[in-house]
Amino acid sequence: MTKALKNNLKRENGSLVQTTICLCNRLCDEKACGQQSFAVGVSGGADSLALVYLLREWALRCGKKIVALTVDHQLRPTSRQEADYVAKLMRQAGIEHHILTWEGEKPVSGIETAAREARYRLLEDWCLSNGIYTIFMA
């Protein structure tokens, strides 16, 4: 984060929403080159839910679109139910949502690394296929 960005953030009114909006505006000005759509990785945990709800506020105020993406790794019997629950939360919040599924056989060892690599590949492939070049993750 640049020194100027840090100083601008300090001048905001201090609320988390205002700070997030300020940060997103600065990121868009500096990096996103006029993009209208952004993706958000949402696992359903507290961090990613907080991020997507804050980004929704920013998107509404700035005329941007956010798309929430959840990866179902299919590693637990309840993983699809968990992803469906996130989909329900996003629907209630008026946020477009897609569930991406890690298909195929899973490795016996190194599962965490393989799952992370599969997650990033799925997210990147979806974004590129849909003309989205920025993804937020918590």
Over which residues does each language-model region extend?
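Core alpha/beta nucleotide-donor-binding catalytic domains of modification enzymes
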Residues: 2-138
